Amino acid sequence: MPRRKRRVRKTPQLKSKPIAPSFVLRYAETEIHETAYKHGVSTFDIHHVCANSSDIFELDQESYEIKILIIGPDSAGNLLEVIGLEINNQSLLIIHAMKIRKSVMNLVEGRS
């Protein structure tokens, strides 16, 4: 009996388009949801990333909400990824913050 080929599941790649760094500054408020603290990133570091972002991307998705990926250094200089939802074109709700992953780093370097 011939052996069947193993199917390898590919992880989905992030699809995004770059945004100007001044994009985050247009929000009147930045709120942080409790899920953003899941990976141990502090409130101060989340605000530091938003204020000193090096790259900002709008993530492509099927939902109606605008999801924004913000990449920048924390207070110690480590790169973090922060994801926020735009709410009513006025505020940004941060829902995710963690040390930058390899897949996101590839996106930044343009190798995706």
Predicted regions, residues:
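Ribonuclease/tRNase effector modules and their secretory precursors
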Residues: M1-S112
